[in-house]
Regions:
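Sequence context surrounding c-type heme c attachment/ligation sites in exported
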Residues: 55-57, 61-64, 71-79, 83-88, ...
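Bacterial Sec-dependent signal peptides at the C-terminal "C-region" and cleavage site
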Residues: 47-57
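N-terminal post-signal-peptidase region of extra-cytosolic proteins
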Residues: 98-113, 136-138
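Short, Lys/Arg-enriched N-terminal segments with co-localized hydrophobic residues
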Residues: 16-32
Length: 227
């Protein structure tokens, strides 16, 4: 939380000369009572402003000296958008079915709610986890288990000529190099994402927001074969 400098103006009562020290010997009782009643209110207002101060726009993407993206820390505390299971954009069956959990920074999420667009330094993290069907009392369906890796999408027009860049992390990887321009992820998002380079068509809480601002590409919601 960004701190706010808060100051209380010094009150000079009628019985005081400038620079004099306030004491019960120099001021009448009513002045002492007035000070005692107003001081707590002033300090309470200061603490209220501090508590209501907006959080700093963080976390933002961080990079090492080589320009590699650092693994986003505490991304599980970000805004959860949606989860998929066994999603595959190709007609061919995937080699492994897994859960994909999508997170975005809370400040970026709020910007989208307010303006219908993703600001620079927005980062999406796709948390990829193994799926299991047998365990504990479960009899049907699947549940999530171990982390398999992270896929990260970053919007940064100052760093990326194409605005959006894509990164892949192993389960325990700490840095990742941006995928080359023209990579498959970029091409797929560019051709099929409903809002900018993001698959808002799969995020039920954001679809109505995008439609309200007129930025939702309805055609991208239609069933089609990804190429």
């Amino acid at each position: 939380m960004q701190g706010i400098a808060c100051s209380v103006q010094r009150t000079v009562w009628p019985c005081q000369e400038p620079g004099a020290i306030l004491s019960h010997l120099e001021c009448p009782p009513e002045a002492i009572v007035k000070f005692a009643l107003t001081a707590p209110l002033i300090f309470a207002l200061c603490f209220t402003f501090l508590a209501a101060a907006p959080e700093e726009k963080s976390p933002k993407p961080q990079y090492d000296t080589k320009g590699n993206l650092l693994r986003p820390a505490d991304y599980r505390d970000w805004m959860f958008l949606s989860a998929g299971y066994g999603m595959n954009y190709s007609p061919s069956p995937g080699s492994h079915e897994m859960f994909t959990n999508v997170f975005v920074q809370r400040w970026a999420y709020q910007e989208f709610l307010d303006h219908g667009k993703w600001p620079d330094e927005t980062a999406f993290v796709i948390d990829e986890r193994d799926a299991q069907s047998k365990g504990s009392i479960n009899k049907t369906g699947h549940f999530q288990t171990d982390l398999m890796g992270l896929a990260v999408e970053v919007k940064d027009s100052r760093r990326n000529p194409d605005k959006w860049a894509y990164y892949g992390f192993d389960a325990d990887g700490q840095t990742a190099e941006a995928m080359p321009r023209g990579n498959g992820c970029y091409a797929c998002h560019d051709a099929h994402a409903a809002v900018e380079h993001t698959f808002v068509q799969f995020y039920p809480t954001l679809k109505p927001v995008a439609k309200k601002f007129g930025v939702y590409n309805e055609a991208r919601e239609q069933v089609s074969d990804a190429k």
